[in-house]
């Protein structure tokens, strides 16, 4: 559904209201801003950087740019929570190559994550090669410039989130990994979890991620200031390689180019597949993303599986038990290190108690009968945890993490039958507006509440108006202004970005977008099992209601055959099975077949170039392109969604 942009005078960003100014002043009074330890640690060991820090693809397409963040040199403005402003300064103004200790280096703020570089006997061991090839290649080039040219001799992916692996082709080639020439080490279930998260639900996650990471916001005091987790997310070329060395159990040892790694499995915590590791040579513990200098997400607003806060706390505790008496340095995949055993262990134990407090108190209140919304209002950290900057809501929040713990144990339903079978948003919006005297009446009353600073309430009631009538200009305008004030007040960067992106979309309409497709790099690395799972998700039931067919696939580049069937409007696929009398048989390379199904090439082109051979009832494939849904990258979020079959 499309709708017209607001008139220019209504579409401009507004200043902070008096209520917002007072809210942010209260934060300034509450927290110990005189504590500068984080700034000292963030700048320690600096070697060099790129000036300006602008990374491009092909010389003209900008994929990452920190040159726009000079405004963060100033004092926090009224339009940014001062605590979040502090985190933004730490993330954006400390970029480049840093020595953690001799032989152990990090490139920070070339992307949302850090790339760690370890000097091995003959080359570089790379930990977490960022989100895009452009950023990882630039980070490696910076290290080679300042530390001397060395080849990459191993890659370690700490976990299954794209900002830690999708830039891998910027530091090695596909053949390096496929041949085993360069070890690529990852945790158990890495491939399945990486592709499940980034492919099966990839389109909806990517769309919501544009809100969470503020991709469409302009940097500035009324716009984007940080992601909280890092300075910004790179928007370059992504890829994927299948690891050739899988770590399965705590205590496993690997020696990579002469450097010993001692692994601890931390599955199902911050990511479904994750490990941390200790480096005895450096007395350094890499906590991956299990600890960071903020409260992380037990549930991420971009959408993902709810994480286990209790297991998360337990894994941090286990790290202290396993390595606490040996470590001198603690570093991670985001933010800055901590030096000194006592400092590092104190920090880790407070991170442990942060997640355990939220877990325990959520369930205490749930057992009294409180629902997730009531619990979120009541769970408050004790000052011993809440006044630590490394525990603040810069990414996750106590509010939405407590709701996540509730859902982890009890699901979305709160037991009240009124919420068991709800109406969809557009329909419920129309009925609320009718009951409340019509849209004009609702907007008039909402404006009074806006003037009183009741922004959460205004957002709730005006959402009903906009969902029932997105062309109601006064409602959209006031709702945009409301989201904006909520964003200005937010300490969480994702909350700020969600609110400000919602305001932008209400004012300017949907951004232009294309059809979602996996990248060629992802396609080449994707196992066939994951490809067929994705095709099953894309199958449109009404279109294939009468289809009953089987397809034998013979992969010319693999010792592998597959059987695919479509019946009952469901696609199933199995390896090492073939139908005796298939409807169709297709022979070709696995890469070409993946590229065809993912829309990166066509069957006609492959057949015409003799890369694909099709036999059997070829006519049964007529219209096959219509069987599978294509997903728009830019579906509406703050206005009614189109009804899909």
State each model region's role.
Residues 1-89, 93:
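N-terminal pre-domain segments of enzymes
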Residues 4-23, 294, 311-374, 378-415, ...:
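Divalent-metal (often Zn2+) His-rich catalytic cores of metallo-beta-lactamase-fold enzymes
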Residues 90-150, 275-279, 283-289:
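Conserved beta-strand hairpin/beta-sheet module of binuclear metal-dependent hydrolase folds
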Residues 99, 123-125, 131-134, 148, 191-267, 311-323, ...:
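Metallo-beta-lactamase
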Residues 122-123, 133-185:
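Active-site metal-binding motif and surrounding structural segment of the metallo-beta-lactamase
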Residues 350, 418-441:
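TPR-adjacent "capping" and linker segments in tetratricopeptide-repeat scaffold/adaptor proteins
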Residues 445-448, 454-460, 467, 471, ...:
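Feature captures hydrophobic
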């Amino acid at each position: 559904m499309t709708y017209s942009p607001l008139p220019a005078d209504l579409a401009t960003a507004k200043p902070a209201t008096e209520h917002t100014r007072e809210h942010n002043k209260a934060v300034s009074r509450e927290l110990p801003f005189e504590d500068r330890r984080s700034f000292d640690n963030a700048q320690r060991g600096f070697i060099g950087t790129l000036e300006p820090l602008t990374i491009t693809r092909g010389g003209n397409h900008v994929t990452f740019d920190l040159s726009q963040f000079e405004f963060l040199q100033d004092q926090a403005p009224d339009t940014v929570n001062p605590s979040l402003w502090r985190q933004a300064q730490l993330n954006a103004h400390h970029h480049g190559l840093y020595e953690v200790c001799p032989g152990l280096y990090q490139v920070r703020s070339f992307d949302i994550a850090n790339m760690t570089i370890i000097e091995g006997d003959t080359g570089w061991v790379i930990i977490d090669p960022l989100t895009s090839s452009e950023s990882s290649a630039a980070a490696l080039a910076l290290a080679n410039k300042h530390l001397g040219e060395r080849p990459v001799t191993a890659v370690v992916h700490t976990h299954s989130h794209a900002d830690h692996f999708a830039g891998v082709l910027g530091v090695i080639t596909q053949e390096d990994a496929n041949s085993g020439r360069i070890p690529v080490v990852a945790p158990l279930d890495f491939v399945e979890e990486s592709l499940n998260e980034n492919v099966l639900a990839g389109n909806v996650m990517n769309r919501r991620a544009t809100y969470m990471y503020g991709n469409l916001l302009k940097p500035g005091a009324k716009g984007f200031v940080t992601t909280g987790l890092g300075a910004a997310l790179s928007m370059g070329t992504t890829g994927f390689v299948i690891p050739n060395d899988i770590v399965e159990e705590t205590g496993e040892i690997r020696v990579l180019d002469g450097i010993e790694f001692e692994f601890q499995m931390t599955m199902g915590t911050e990511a479904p597949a994750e490990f941390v590791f200790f480096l005895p040579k450096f007395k350094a513990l890499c906590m991956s993303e299990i600890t960071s200098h903020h409260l992380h997400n037990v549930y991420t607003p971009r959408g993902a599986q709810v994480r286990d806060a209790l297991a998360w706390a337990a894994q941090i505790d286990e790290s202290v038990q396993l390595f606490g008496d040996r470590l001198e340095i603690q570093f991670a995949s985001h933010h800055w290190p901590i030096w000194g055993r006592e400092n590092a262990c104190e920090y880790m134990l407070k991170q442990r108690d942060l997640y355990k407090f939220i877990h325990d108190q959520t369930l205490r209140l749930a057992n009294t009968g409180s629902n997730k919304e009531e619990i979120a209002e009541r769970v408050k950290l004790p000052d011993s945890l809440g006044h630590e900057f490394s525990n603040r809501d810069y990414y996750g929040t106590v509010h939405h993490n407590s709701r996540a713990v509730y859902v982890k144990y009890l699901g979305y339903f709160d037991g009240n039958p009124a919420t068991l079978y709800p109406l969809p948003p557009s329909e419920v919006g129309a009925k609320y507006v009718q009951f409340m005297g019509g849209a004009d009446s609702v907007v008039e009353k909402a404006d009074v509440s806006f003037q009183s600073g009741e922004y959460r309430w205004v957002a709730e009631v005006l959402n009903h108006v906009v969902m029932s009538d997105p062309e109601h200009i006064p409602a959209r305008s006031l709702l945009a202004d409301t989201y904006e004030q909520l964003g200005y007040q937010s300490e969480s960067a994702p909350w700020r970005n969600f609110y400000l992106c919602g305001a932008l979309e209400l004012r300017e309409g949907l951004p232009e977008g294309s059809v979602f497709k996996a990248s060629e790099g992802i396609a080449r690395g994707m196992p066939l099992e994951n490809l067929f799972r994705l095709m099953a998700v894309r199958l449109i039931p009404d279109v294939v209601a009468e289809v009953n067919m089987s397809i034998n696939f013979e992969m010319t580049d693999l010792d592998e055959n597959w059987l695919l069937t479509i019946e009952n409007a469901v696609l199933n696929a199995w390896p090492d099975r073939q139908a005796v009398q298939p409807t169709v048989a297709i022979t070709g390379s696995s890469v070409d077949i993946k590229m065809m199904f993912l829309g990166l090439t066509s069957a006609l082109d492959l057949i015409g170039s003799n890369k694909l051979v099709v036999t059997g009832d070829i006519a049964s494939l007529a219209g096959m392109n219509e069987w599978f849904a294509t997903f728009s990258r830019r579906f509406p979020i703050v206005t009614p969604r189109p009804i899909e079959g």
